[in-house]
């Protein structure tokens, strides 16, 4: 499991800021150092940018270009390099001897060889097209659940009042999310404060639940 995964939905009780994101990553780094593990990976969803205010992005210290409406053009920059630059600055300020490298994960993930699940899922969707066509269904997208049941999905069911498709957000109250954020990640808790003091003066500033106001 990855020591830290950061998605915008986890900030359901506080604002998304660069400071909180950096502290969450450092929280995982500190926990790994306490455990004697000298490596790790933090995944940060690029979606966090869409939940930040323009002021937060502008005050990050990163030089962005802006569109005609004054919004930062996020598509022109590498999000991984932005976070890594800010993270390295923070690590140096704390005096931590930790190196980090940015990796932008993009379309190459979609270009790997298909696995058994991919082959099965695509086959089900293909059969689903024929099934719904035979039933006279049109103007819909074919979907299949984990049981293989095929159903049509109409645009009107997923668009808002302005005709835009509503993004599907992670349900933080769902069992999968609870399992990941409660049991799979590694971060500072009150039980780690004493051990973490050898690396930072205020370990409570990196307490996972305090950062998210959980």
Where are these regions (language model features)?
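C-terminal non-catalytic interaction/assembly regions of soluble proteins
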Residues: 57-214
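Accessory alpha-helical/coil subdomains and C-terminal extensions
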Residues: 1-98
């Amino acid at each position: 499991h990855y020591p830290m995964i950061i998605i915008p939905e986890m900030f359901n009780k506080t604002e998304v800021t660069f400071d909180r994101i950096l502290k969450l990553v450092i929280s995982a780094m500190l926990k790994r150092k306490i455990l004697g593990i000298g490596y790790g990976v933090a995944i940060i969803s690029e979606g966090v940018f869409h939940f930040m205010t323009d002021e937060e992005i502008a005050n990050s210290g990163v030089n962005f270009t802006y569109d005609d409406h004054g919004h930062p053009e996020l598509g022109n920059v590498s999000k991984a390099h932005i976070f890594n630059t800010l993270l390295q600055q923070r690590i140096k300020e704390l005096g931590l001897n930790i190196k980090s490298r940015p990796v932008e994960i993009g379309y190459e993930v979609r270009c790997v060889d298909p696995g058994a699940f991919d082959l099965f899922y695509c086959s089900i969707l293909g059969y689903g097209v024929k099934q719904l066509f035979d039933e006279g269904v049109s103007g819909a997208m074919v979907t299949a659940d984990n049981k293989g049941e095929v159903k049509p999905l109409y645009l009107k069911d997923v668009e808002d009042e302005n005709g835009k498709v509503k993004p599907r957000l992670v349900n933080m109250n769902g069992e999968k999310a609870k399992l990941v954020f409660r049991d799979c990640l590694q971060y500072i808790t009150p039980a780690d404060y004493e051990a973490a003091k050898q690396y930072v003066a205020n370990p409570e500033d990196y307490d996972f639940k305090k950062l998210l106001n959980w």
